[in-house]
């Protein structure tokens, strides 16, 4: 995405993650140390060169607003069942019947601006969990899962290679998954590298 947008990786990552979490231009300005005009130019350049990111975000948000859920890559539902007033302000998101009682009927689904993030994080979790099951079926048991990392005790480098292969092919995608495998006496020692 950074190459497509014509900006450095750190900036592209900040914009991407910021969009997924609903970061506004003011927050982006302070994160990147830019003034308002520089931020506007950067945002325009990013969206002109990488329009699919904003389109995907808007599509996910619309679906969450209209249907109340999204399905992850493996079909799990990410629900948006809480409601809040349409009027701008700080309001507690509530189940529909409570929200109607508290705020009236002019409501919208809460947190839908985070729909793309929920879709990506949920799909990543699906793939990691499926890889754990696939590995278990081959007799390789993970001890710990941290986000998209698995910690396993193995007997040989061949096992590490097999773990890498299973994780890369647990879900076949158009864009290949790349997995790093590291071997060490403990997870702590590997993380120090």
Q: How should these model regions be labeled?
A:
Residues 1-193:
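Conserved catalytic core of nucleotide polymerization and phosphodiester-bond processing enzymes
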